[in-house]
Design a protein with these regions (language model features):
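Core SAM-dependent methyltransferase catalytic element
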Residues: 195-208
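Conserved beta-strand signature within the Rossmann-like core of class I S-adenosyl-L-methionine
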Residues: 163-170
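Conserved class I S-adenosyl-L-methionine
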Residues: 2-57
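Class I SAM-dependent methyltransferase SAM/SAH-binding core
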Residues: 65, 71-121
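A short glycine-rich, Lys/Arg-flanked "PGG" loop and its adjoining helix->strand segment in the class I
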Residues: 150-162
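A short SAM/SAH-binding and catalytic strip from SAM-dependent methyltransferases
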Residues: 132-147
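Short alpha-helix
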Residues: 174-186
C-alpha cells in the first residue's frame, strides 16, 4: 500500500483560503494552475492509493468519472495507471474545462468533458452511461454544505455500475463519521476511510 500523502500539501479549492476563487475568470484559472505543479507532485501518493483501491485489473477498459475534475490532474494519473481506461471529466467551470482539455492533450481520444455544477440538484443529468469508478479530488468540500454534499453522493450512486466504486480524496470537517454515513445512505457498501490525517481523507465505498 502506498504511503500517505505528504503533510506539506496545501490542496487547491480550499474553502479556508482568505481569497475567494474565481473559477470563471480565464486569467485567474491560468494563474492558479501555474502554481499547482508542486501540489500535484505532493498528491501523487494519494492518487496512487486511490488508483490501487479501484477494484479492477489495470489492463481492463474501465470507464471513470472524475467529479470536479478541474484541470484533470487525477484523470491524467488514472489514465496512465489504467492504460485502457477512458474518462469523463465533470466540472462547473468552463475555463477549467478548457484548461483540462489542454493539459490532457496527450490523452486525446480517451476523455471527454462535461460542464455541470454539482452544487445544483440534477447536475448528473448531463452525464450519460455508467462507470466502474466515480472519483473526486479536493473538490466536493467546496460546496460547504452537508445537505448539498449528501445530494452529490446520492446522485453519484446511480452512475456507478454494480461492482464499481466511489472514491473521494478531499478536505473534510468534523465530525468525520458524517462523511461515511452520507456515503452509506447513498447506497454504497463497505464504506470506510482508506487513509486520513487531521484535515484530509480518502474514503468511499462499493456498489454491490
Amino acid at each position: 500500500m502506498s504511503k500517505p500523502p505528504h503533510s506539506s500539501e496545501h490542496p487547491h479549492h480550499d474553502h479556508h483560503d482568505h481569497n475567494p476563487h474565481d473559477w470563471h475568470s480565464p486569467e485567474y484559472v491560468s494563474k492558479w494552475a501555474d502554481g499547482q505543479d508542486q501540489k500535484e507532485l505532493d498528491r501523487q501518493d494519494a492518487f496512487r492509493l486511490l488508483a490501487e483501491t479501484i477494484p479492477y485489473d489495470k489492463s481492463l477498459p474501465i470507464r471513470i468519472l472524475d467529479v470536479g475534475a478541474g484541470y484533470g490532474a487525477l484523470t491524467q494519473f488514472l489514465l496512465q495507471y489504467f492504460p485502457n481506461a477512458t474518462a469523463v471529466c465533470q466540472d462547473g467551470s468552463e475555463e477549467m474545462i478548457k484548461l483540462g482539455r489542454y493539459r490532457l492533450a496527450s490523452q486525446h481520444g480517451r476523455f471527454t468533458c462535461v460542464l455541470s455544477n454539482f452544487s445544483k440538484s440534477g447536475w448528473s443529468r448531463e452525464l450519460t452511461g455508467h462507470f466502474e469508478a466515480v472519483v473526486s479530488s479536493i473538490a466536493i468540500h467546496n460546496v460547504n454544505s452537508p445537505n448539498i454534499i449528501r445530494g452529490i453522493y446520492d446522485e453519484i450512486f446511480p452512475l456507478v455500475k454494480p461492482g464499481g466504486c466511489f472514491l473521494n480524496y478531499d478536505l473534510i470537517q468534523p465530525p468525520w463519521e458524517d462523511q461515511l454515513k452520507w456515503v452509506k445512505q447513498a447506497g454504497f457498501a463497505d464504506v470506510k476511510f482508506f487513509w486520513k490525517d487531521e484535515r484530509r481523507a480518502l474514503f468511499g465505498g462499493f456498489k454491490r
